[in-house]
Amino acid sequence: MANGRMSMYSVASEGLGGPRAGQQPSQFSTTTLLNAIHNIYLSSQPFKLDAGTSLVVNTWLTASQTGPDGRTGGTIDAALGARAWEHARRRAEDGCIVLGSLHTSCPSLLTPFLSSLPLSLPSSLYKSLEAIQPFLRCSTPYNPSTPRQIALGVTLTLNLTGSLRGAAIALSQGGIDSTKGLLNIPVEAGYRAFDVFYYLLTSASTPAEREFLGLKSASSYALLAKSGTYEPPSYLPTADDAAAADDFRSALKDIGIKGSAHRNLISTLAGLLKLGDTLDYNLDEDVFDEICEDVSGLLGMDPETLATQCTTEDRATLVGGLYEALVDWVISKANEAISAQMVRIRDGTESIGGGGARTPTSNGEDDTVCITILDIPDPTLGKALAMRGVFDDTLGINSEMIADGVEVSAAGSTVVREMQAAIGEVGHELGIMTSATGRDRQHALEKREEVLEKIGHSADEDAFLKKLLFPITGQGIDLGRAGRLDLSSLLSSSRVWYHLSIHPTDDSPASLAALPSINSAWSAGTVSRQLRSWRLPEWANRRNKNLDFTADFDIDEFVQRYALLGCKDGREGIETWILERGWTNGEVVVGKERVWVRESAWWEAESMLDMKPLDSNLPGMGNVMAVNNLESGYSANGSGYFPTPMLDTTPNGSRDHLIAHQRNFSQGNLSQHTLAHNAAMRAPSVAPSGMRNVQAGDYGLGTKGDTFKGQVFYNNEGEFVGQMDPEIADGKHVEEKTMDKDRRIWVAIVWFWTFWIPSPLLSFVGRMKRPDVRMAWREKLTLVWFIVLINAAIVFWIVAFGKILCPNFDKAWNAKEVAYHTGENDFYVSFRGGVYDISKFWKIQHSDTAIETTKENMMPFAGLNMDDYFPPPLPLVCPGLGIAPTTTLQYNNTPEYVIGIHKSGILADDRTSALGATDWYSTKLLPKMREFYKGDLVWDKAFINSDGQNNDHMWVIYNGGVYDLTNYFKTLKVFQRVDSVNFLNADIVSAIESNPGEDVTDSWDEIVKTAANNATENASVQNSLNCIKNLFYVGIPDFRYSARCQTNNYIMLAMTIILCSVILVKFLAALQFGSKRRPAPQDKFVICQVPAYTEGEDSLRKALDSLTALQYDNKRKLICVICDGIIVGAGNDRPTPKIVLDILGVDPKVDPPALPFKSVGTGSEQLNYGKVYSGLYEFEGNVVPYLVVVKCGKESEQTKSKPGNRGKRDSQILLMSFLNRVHHRAPMSPLELEMFHQINNIIGVDPELYEYLMMVDADTCVREDSLNRLVSACANDAKIAGICGETGLQNDDKSWWTMIQVYEYFISHNLAKAFESLFGSVTCLPGCFTMYRLRTVDKGKPLIIADGVIRDYAVCDVDTLHKKNLLSLGEDRYLTTLMTKYFPSMKYKFIPDAYCQTAAPESWSVLLSQRRRWINSTIHNLFELMKLKEMCGFCCFSMRFVVFIDLFGTIILPATTIYLGYMIYLAASSTGQFPIISIIMLAAVYGLQALIFILKRQWQHIGWMIIYIMAFPIYSFALPIYSFWNQDNFSWGNTRIVIGEKGNKQLVAVDDEGFDPRSIPLQRWDDYAMANNLPGRRGGYMEKADMGYDDQYEMDEIRSVYSSVRQGSVLTGMNRNNTYMPPQSPAPFGHMVRASGAASPYHHDQAMANRQSMASLGTHDINRGQTPFQDFPSSRPSVSNLRGQANPSPGLGANRSQSALGLNRPHAAAQSTSSFDFQRGNMQGPDDSMIIEAIQGVLREVDLDTVTKKQVRALVEQRLQTGLVGERRTFMDRQIDNELANM
């Protein structure tokens, strides 16, 4: 017989065993039972009637609330399910749990009870129940969800380890009560038919579906219209058929009913509704025939069969039978879905709950047992079944007990008669067909079979109807038998457990909603009636007295099972053993052939059996469950991990109680309990061993990845196989989260911009099935749209905005500007107020005279005004003024080049040439010139005025034109105003003479207006104005200096000044002349964190070697490598953690335990496990301590390709959280306790001493002096919170893609970061090479380890696009942003002297991915920066605002590229004004950059700059565009899916078992160390006194409780005589509250002998070792001795402060003030001797010639780590004077 026994740490606790026999009440009465029921009802707890029966009280209201155990669905007894599970797997016997209802108003508990079982059930099971329930339930006045099935069972098949192997759903043979649920619904209000019909008719149906099915309103169907109730009860808070219909359709789809199957289903349902209309005897014949046609079309059968071969009774029978057959079909599809998922789970391709873990295999794979959870909603049937099992002594186990000689008191005759009456009512459901009800039932079934067979044969051959009625080809109607449960057979072959539900009142369910609380409804009479009806008092008395045996054995079987516990053979041996155990005859009864055991005694024996290996000499906890090949003693499932939240939730069986129970044998207490007996079991491992076999030589990490060379598929030995579906997962429940205001606003904006894109389009065309993915796409589109708008706005502003404000700005020239265009291809002239480009004309021979068009003749005219060279014939341009053809004007200025004068008409010099034509000017010249027109000639308005007023320049402005009549007035003067030349209107001439240089528009308009009344005068005025416009027009006033035209220029000028200033400041910031200063060696403690992921061995070795070789005190730096999961990188032949451990020289046989800690993840991913290794690493003579943390993941992750992987951010948080807890002395997780132990006791440095955290990537090499330079900069400026150095490339010439990055890396640091650093605002401290200060210097306030920083940085639900880009792509930049947010007054600096080299992407794809992360994280960090109150300052006058503007350039990179292209086009095509300013700025940018590396003599960067400029379009256009569009390109997890956001709520579908913080036990270090006798306690406890012991305190003896292995790597051959000194408290006065060594009650218990040192890394400072701050007051020299003792005896402390690794332990004198414990304060404060010694120490170290007394006082207080006030300060001042006087 297979033994299903697990460990003592399984589901069972003392609550499972139950009370012993003597602990039950002697007698139950109705009153005592009623009181007990009332009490448990008020507390929402179950009541244990006997070992196999539990009572609960439920209403629909309690079922809709979350109970004390965190579950919804009502009160249930999870312990009952746990007991049934334990019995099934341990006893290899089938079980049946009957869920009975004592009242028709009781809600169904099937689903919540299933969820409480200690099993991970497949998600498809819950989906199946969700799909089936609408077919079985309907609303009634007494129950909003009344089940109409006779019984519904869920059978779970288990192997003998208790693991699930299969599941199936089945109705009982009684089927469904379709009469009450469909055919004959009561006519009173409140009754409805089965819910599925209302779901069919809701708006959830598509229009096409409704049209195809011919659906109408519910009131139109006879079956549904009887009661007039069509809506669900309004008192239900979630009553909505449409929403329920959506869930129902989704559930159908999930179990495979989709496509044609779904169409067949809804067609059948619609056909049944219509068929119900034919049951009316008064139906019109035509309507009847039409309905039959419709129904036959929907069902696929002959309409004649319905119309002529079926009576009304037959059709009613058909409705009920066909509906039941349809439900059977749905259940069969559900079982197929469950079976398919279980196959996938067994194959390892899918997890049992969608979370990644598959069911582990075991030796009991072939032996299975079944547990059936049987839901019986009918109180009558439930009562008959239960009373038959309890009171009938002629059947079942009762008769077996009596036959075996067990004394059983007979049930009372009244009870027996009532039992028989109850059975008689429902005998046909129990297979009793001899009664009247049985015969009636048999007849009805035969009639149904006949009708169904007739209809089935008339159905079309391929019709769905035929498949429903004949599911097995070749067999007849088998409805009610195939796939059904036989209740009688099931109950007789199983151990039966009863879970009975009571309803507290007969009041209507609607009235419960108005009650003040969910437990207010109570009617003692109602409850009493239910108790008496089921005879529960008699039940309890009978079972507890005689029949409460839950286990029975054959005699030999009992001996065989408990032989290990001392049970001897034979009946006498058993009885003797029972007496030895102290059990009474009532607890264990030895019958004739069998042994009958009560639950408490059975469980006690099983627990002792589980504990038995603890007393044997088996090799460790791994064999506690050797029977099942499970290896851990920590878990409830043998997983090797802490218990999971699936346990008993009763007061005596709660999960917390279980953990408390286990605490007696686990963790620290287990170590104390067993260390004396078995050294091998000193520290139980919690390594994840349940899924794989860890062999020696694997570092305890298993063989995963060792032989697969980077492939992502693994074999079936617990390894990953195939691909997981990243999008679809089942079994989710929905959480509701409140969205903050910013998110709500953003969501509204997103929908405003993208509402026009329908979600179905994204779902089906874009293949975005998930709502959160679609929302991210919408957010991406909105952001891209904004970015496009911003870029377009920038380009528009630069290129077009000015043109819109001033359209012709670039089409206007003044005379001086025209004169600039004098080139052969830039030949401009002005003529008659216009500017012309005749570059293509002047070279042409355009003269028909002897004059040749040569360069010498033409070039002098370039840039000139040509008005005087082309005098027009006056009658031609001034018609109507009576001008003679020979009249000409006298020119005020004589043309310089006579050869260019072109007189035409009668005045032409050569009348035979083309110029001789009278109209040459108007028909030849002017049209030709228009071809070369460029714009207007403009004149400065002020110049026009001053020249007219002061120089008699006779020009005026009229209607926006400038008219120069100087030549006209010169002619009048020369000819003394004779009529022949005085042809203009006198009034107009007078206005000009009176207002030279002014605007005469008003005066001329007045003249025109006055002349309008006189035709002659009007003609004169109009002709004069026409003449002036044709002859004297010289241009327009210069509009380019107007406010409208200058606004944009001034804006651009201001921006240009800002940009030029930034460029100049960047340049100056990068200039650092002179030799590099060599800072003094620093002595601060630094942690060098190296996150490792998939790097190769070469990269890792270079990084670790470079850190080891740093020119820094080896004892004061710690290399902390955090391996992010057990992952095989591309090109590697084994996982990264193994590569790291191999490089560090860790012994492969080392197998530390896997310890739990909280990770950054969603749901259950927050629980992670890690292994800790420590030791010393040597490189080139440098020996440095290291700490390696390998995140190995939960047991369920071991089948995945990346167990333990949570990302780089999690690796950072792991260390930051640890240091935070160290700082606050807060409770730590087991992993953190182990880290503390390794650092404090093994490496030998109190973790609180570390002041800096340097983050270095695993592919980065740091230059030797870099760390010292970083620490020195921080030491010189206490305001620095973060600092970084310059990063260069180590693979600069590997490919074209690395080459284009060289110059960018150089300039981004030496310009961008240097500029930001000037203002202490470096916006991105790169994770590859950055150092953070842990605490402020003055007050010890945490910085990078502050609660706020860690809280915001450790966000787990990264479920929006913004969070993804912040936390998944730009961790380093966001961490800097958080630091800026929380500590705006601190500085974030860059120093170029600290240098490192990293590996740049060598391929385009990797570069693309990297820049996508960088660019998108920059964009999203901008939004975070904008939220900072200190960002802009007053009126934006803030340097951080300038830095923000600099970052803003990332968004407008495409616009920059477009504008550069536009400028190149302008310069090349000469189509516009040459962008001289832009060209100058570009030259300045790159010129200053070039000047930087030229001055720094970095000549190679000249070539790199050229390459970078060639690649500029890639950097500034291709990469940003790609990045912007791929902001939503993520691997979206499927455990938490945001399915909707509306208002201030966010709905999240959670497909995960969730994270229970209680799964990670937390404990303070001091409590942990005290409990496990570890050294290094920090305060409040007596530390190890300095006592000499002969034996040595070995390394193995100071392991933590979690450590069962030696340290990772050691250096042997060192001095073995170093005395161990426990780590002192970082609080300098912690020893004041401790007893001295002589008086301590722990003096002997905690005294520790000397122990072997692993390595000795230097000499011990004797003076420092005797500082008064050490924790050995009993051995501290007296004050009098201190004054004269320059060199204390070595025997007083030399070498005793070394750690397990031989590192000299630093004392308080070497501590930074930042390590002071500000929570505990100064305790009692320093005494006189301490102040004196501090003064002496300061005076020995300072320069007495330069130091002041104030400085000495400050140094003393710093050394004491406290401020002295009052008498203490007076004493210090006096003592300083005394010491100085004695020197």
Curated annotation (Swiss-Prot):
InterPro entries: Chitin_synth, Cyt_B5-like_heme/steroid-bd, Cyt_B5-like_heme/steroid_sf, DEK_C, Kinesin_motor_dom_sf, Myosin_head_motor_dom-like, Nucleotide-diphossugar_trans, P-loop_NTPase. GO terms for cellular component: cell septum; myosin complex; plasma membrane. GO terms for biological process: chitin biosynthetic process; fungal-type cell wall organization. Residues 1664-1688 have a biased composition (Polar residues). The keyword Transferase applies. Disruption phenotype: Reduces the content of chitin in conidia walls. Signal peptide: none annotated. It is an enzyme of class 2 (transferase). The chain crosses the membrane at residues 745-765, 781-801, 1051-1071, 1441-1461, 1474-1494, 1502-1522. Its main location: membrane. It catalyses: [(1->4)-N-acetyl-beta-D-glucosaminyl](n) + UDP-N-acetyl-alpha-D-glucosamine = [(1->4)-N-acetyl-beta-D-glucosaminyl](n+1) + UDP + H(+). It is found in: Cell membrane. It is a multi-pass membrane protein. Glycans are attached at N159, N637, N652, N664, N669, N1014, N1018, N1416, N1529, N1617, N1695. Residues 1725-1781 form the DEK-C domain. Its EC number is 2.4.1.16. It comes from the Eukaryota. Residues 1659-1724 are annotated as: Disordered. Keywords: Cell membrane, Glycoprotein, Glycosyltransferase, Membrane, Motor protein, Myosin, Transferase, Transmembrane, Transmembrane helix. The keyword Nucleotide-binding does not apply. Polymerizes chitin, a structural polymer of the cell wall and septum, by transferring the sugar moiety of UDP-GlcNAc to the non-reducing end of the growing chitin polymer. Responsible for about 29% of the chitin in conidial walls, is essential for conidial wall strength in media with high water potential and contributes to strength of hyphal tips. Belongs to the chitin synthase family. Class V subfamily. PANTHER family: CHITIN SYNTHASE. This is Chitin synthase A. It comes from Colletotrichum graminicola (Maize anthracnose fungus). The lineage of its organism: Eukaryota, Fungi, Dikarya, Ascomycota, Pezizomycotina.
